[in-house]
Every structure is written in C-alpha cells, then in structure tokens.
Amino acid sequence: MRQLLPGNTVWRNIRLATMDPQRQAPYGLVDNQALIVREGHICDIVPETQLPVSGDNIHDMQGRLVTPGLIDCHTHLVFAGNRAAEWEQRLNGASYQHISAQGGGINATVSATRACAEETLYLLARERMMRLASEGVTLLEIKSGYGLELATEEKLLRVAAKLAAENAIDISPTLLAAHATPAEYRDDPDGYITLVCETMIPQLWQKGLFDAVDLFCESVGFNVAQSERVLQTAKALGIPVKGHVEQLSLLGGAQLVSRYQGLSADHIEYLDEAGVAAMRDGGTVGVLLPGAFYFLRETQRPPVELLRRYQVPVAVASDFNPGTSPFCSLHLAMNMACVQFGLTPEEAWAGVTRHAARALGRQATHGQLRAGYRADFVVWDAEQPVEIVYEPGRNPLYQRVYRGQIS
C-alpha cells in the first residue's frame, strides 16, 4: 500500500480519459485509476489498489469519467452590444454591404465597445467566461479586436487581465488589432496597419498585456502584404503569431502564417493542399470554427481528410463573437465539428484538449492528464467521452478541478 505524502490530494475510483497519445486505448482511456495531485499539478496516475480507500484528502468519484479540462483556443469574449437586429435583416434578404453602409457589421460592435465603460465590459465578459467554465473549460483564449484604436484595444486586454486575476480560469490574451479597418481609416488600410505595427504591437507588448498576435487575412480583411507586415513586426519582437485565414477565399494566408511558425491557422474552410503542407512544415495547428460556418450558412468545408493525411493537429473552438458565432458553448462546437466537418468524437476531444493546448503554446503543461501537467480536469456524470459530444444541450459536469482545487 502506497502512503500519501502530506499535501497530496487523491481522486480515486475513476475512469480516466487522459487524452495522452502514448496510451493505446481510444481517448487514452484507463480504468480503475487514481489521480494524485500536489500543489496544482498531477504527481502521478496509479492503480487505485495501491492507495488507501478513504481519508481526509481522498475523493471517491464512484466510477465517474475524468477528462482534462477543456480548452477554448479561439474566442472574442470581450465586446459590448449584439448584432441580433442585423442577423434578422440578413435572414430577410439584406446584403452585408447594405448592413455595413447603415453602420452595421463589425463597425457596429467597434462603436459599442469603444463607448462602453471598462467595468461594464468586464461584467459582460465575466458572465460569458463563467458560462464556459460551467462546461468544464479551464483554459480560455481571449482576443481583442473590437477597439481598432490603441486606447480601446488596451482596454479590452486590461479586461482580459482582470478576468485572469480572478484565478477561476486560465486566460491566454491575444492582440487582434489587425481584425478590420476602422471607419476612420476606411480609405487608408495601409495607414492603419502602420499604426498597428509601429504603435499598438510594441506599446501593448511592452505592457505585458498579450501572449500572441493575430490577424484577419481575407478579402474583406487585410491582404497578404499587409498581413505579412504584422507578422514581421511581431516576430521581430519575439511574439508568437496566429491568423484567421482562408475562411471566405483562398489567399495563401495559411502558408504565410506557417512561414512564420504560427501557432495556429484558424477557420481554413478554403485551405488547399499547399497550405496544409505548409502548416505541417511550420508546426501550425489547424483550428476549426464550426459555429461561424453554421451561422454564416457557409458551404465550403475545411479539408479535414487532407489535414489527417498530412498529420496536422486539429483543434476545435467556439469562436464566440457577436457577429458570426454567437455560441458561448464549447460542447456545441464539438458536436458541430463532428456533424458538419466529419470529425470523429475522439478527434473533437483532442481538438479541445491537447491540440487546443498546442494552438496556445501550452502543450507541455495543459491538455492531457499526465504526471507533471497542470491539475486541471473535469469529473463527468458519464461513462464515455462521446456522451459530452453527442448531446450538447445536456451538461453532465459533476466537478471541475482547476489548479488542483475543486471550483
């Protein structure tokens, strides 16, 4: 019988879906195990017969399923207002160009967010964050991008920092100043990119407000040359990069981001084989965002089979935002990725655990249940991981553990 050291906490009588690729079973499943936690990290995973049955720091989970904490690696969580009215207009036949001419589209969210007090933005974002936490999310990426000016971009990143300070969920903040051209630069997008590169990135990086730089390389966003200026600026400062690419057309954005060893290429509906090969060579994760595909009623699906063939890691995220994916649910995104894009449930699980961790540069500490990894995990009233993917409207979460503490 193994003796527990003082300060150790044990979860026993569990079915572990470790998501460890070194384990042969689907989902890295192992039965009749015990998880030993100390100081916020997993010390060991051992057969439960090696440990005492009961004690002050022993939690008997009665055979429940345990998985790594979920990771939502692509969200636009901090914003004000909503775009419900323009969604109704679109369904009644209005074009995006018509809506934009009336002040709608992303600029409507930018205007509302610029005008919103920081404390109000914080309260709005906190409610959304806790919704994701209630689904078992323990690591969350938050992008800026609804300021499109230095002061408001900084305000959004300060909100993300305030959320992180609550110590309820890990936050990975991303600067997405190159999200769209603001109205005041409508006729000078190159001038706006100069502002992003010469002012926003260096000043906000110096303040320690973000972990990575993102951009929107698209026909309705920024072209390849403008996008490369952003990537060059970030890389010169040693900042990891990522990109919204190939969502609505094939511009070569995935190849561009991969050339800069981007953490991830996101959306990728129009990705071609050359882009997939570049992602493999650049170590870039493909992030699927089925909520936007569904909400925009797109028809071009990401090349999932090509990604499999080239062994490119595939993550899945909510893309929660007011304009194209108003779905604050990672469970729903997992289901959509299977139904719409043809992922298997196991691939969807990998997409919100170990591959999502890689998309945030956290693969050495998050996304798997292994000795030395962070003790972020979820106990479910379920027998199999597929149950969480199969029925997204039902949340069988029993217990969420963050940094070794029940939360």
Curated annotation (Swiss-Prot):
Sorted UniProt keywords? Cytoplasm, Histidine metabolism, Hydrolase, Iron, Metal-binding, Zinc
Its annotated compartments are: Cytoplasm
State the organism named in the record.
Salmonella paratyphi C (strain RKS4594)
Give the cofactor note. Answer: Binds 1 zinc or iron ion per subunit.
Record-level Gene Ontology MF annotations: imidazolonepropionase activity; iron ion binding; zinc ion binding
Task: Name the family.
Answer: Belongs to the metallo-dependent hydrolases superfamily. HutI family.
From the broadest rank down, the organism's phylogenetic lineage runs: Bacteria, Pseudomonadati, Pseudomonadota, Gammaproteobacteria, Enterobacterales
Example GO biological process term?
L-histidine catabolic process to glutamate and formamide
Q: What is its EC number?
A: 3.5.2.7
Record-linked Pfam families: Amidohydro_1 (PF01979)
State the source organism's domain of life.
Answer: Bacteria
Q: Which InterPro entries match?
A: Amidohydro-rel, HutI, Metal-dep_hydrolase_composite, Metal_Hydrolase
Q: Which residues bind N-formimidoyl-L-glutamate?
A: 146, 321, 323
Catalytic activity of the protein: 4-imidazolone-5-propanoate + H2O = N-formimidoyl-L-glutamate
The pathway it acts in is: Amino-acid degradation; L-histidine degradation into L-glutamate; N-formimidoyl-L-glutamate from L-histidine: step 3/3
Membrane-spanning parts: none
Binding-site list for 4-imidazolone-5-propanoate: 83, 146, 179, 247, 324
**Gene Ontology cellular component annotations, sorted alphabetically:** cytoplasm
Give the EC class as a word.
hydrolase
| Cofactors (names) | Zn(2+); Fe(3+)
The entry's protein name is: Imidazolonepropionase
What does the entry list as the binding residues for Fe(3+)? 74, 76, 244, 319
